[in-house]
């Protein structure tokens, strides 16, 4: 089994080497693609846009992103996937030959296990929601037309073009092996397709959100403690990253599995708090919600405020404090987009309307 994995990993290393040598001029493009494909953009950019265009799509998108990334964490703990940037330097597979020269980049040195790819899985799931939702909006109750069929082809071609670029980006940056990005894409689509059949997420109570958040945290923590009790070190990848990353400053605490877990759980709980708040009911359930200028104002204000939130980085000197602050910061993202900003704008527009009378 180990020999087969070594052959598979060697194929991945050769693929990375080929891309880095033959597409050296595309370095900036691949780095940009990897940055854009980060799941953070689904929370800070795509969610507020889609929520204020059509609430159900935004809610579905956030659930797919959060639960998909949670499954990604569990899969990584089970599969113990290597990453190219440390495997090529750590393995004895090349003991009788020269070690392939693999470049590293500022976004290469992620600290979690490599399989499946979180970038590929997140992008596949989130963009699947956007494509299928867009097609559902344009399809409506009408029969399929030539224009709709063209839109269908264009959107799916665009979808697979995005997935291809994300996969090539992760391989180029030596962050993942080819089989890991393929597994990520398939897993992301599976999660998104599953949630397309779950209707309970659109009217879930705050109690249900709390229970699900607690379950996801409890399961992950219990699974971690169980494997640790069996002698399995689930933080083995952090040592690999610190040892083999070209520059220490490229190793970031926010790429650890627990950092991802706390950010996702905070986001989910924040959505539950927002959707069940009085501010949301007062601002998003009235006639004002149907106004296009109001929705556009909510989108612009949300993107601006969330950009400020994103620039605030919790101190990472103490891990426990970092995780708690990451949880709280993530919870404010959907809460601000869904309830706080619409409520403030509704009050402001209401007062302006009264003065005009």
UniProtKB/Swiss-Prot annotation:
Gene Ontology biological process terms from the UniProt entry: cellular response to insulin stimulus; cholesterol homeostasis; gluconeogenesis; glucose 6-phosphate metabolic process; glucose homeostasis; glucose-6-phosphate transport; glycogen catabolic process; glycogen metabolic process
In terms of Pfam families, this protein maps to: PAP2
Q: Which InterPro entries match?
A: Glucose-6-phosphatase, P_Acid_Pase_2/haloperoxi_sf, P_Acid_Pase_2/haloperoxidase
Query: Residues that bind substrate, according to the entry?
Result: 83, 170
Chain ranges on the Lumenal side, renumbered to this chain: 1-28, 82-117, 169-170, 233-254, 313-320
GO MF, any single term:
phosphotransferase activity, alcohol group as acceptor
What CDD domains does its record include? PAP2_glucose_6_phosphatase
Give the enzyme's EC designation: 3.1.3.9
Per UniProt, what is the membrane topology?
Multi-pass membrane protein
Q: What does this protein do?
A: Hydrolyzes glucose-6-phosphate to glucose in the endoplasmic reticulum. Forms with the glucose-6-phosphate transporter (SLC37A4/G6PT) the complex responsible for glucose production in the terminal step of glycogenolysis and gluconeogenesis. Hence, it is the key enzyme in homeostatic regulation of blood glucose levels.
What's the protein called, per UniProt?
Glucose-6-phosphatase catalytic subunit 1
What is the species of this protein?
Rattus norvegicus (Rat)
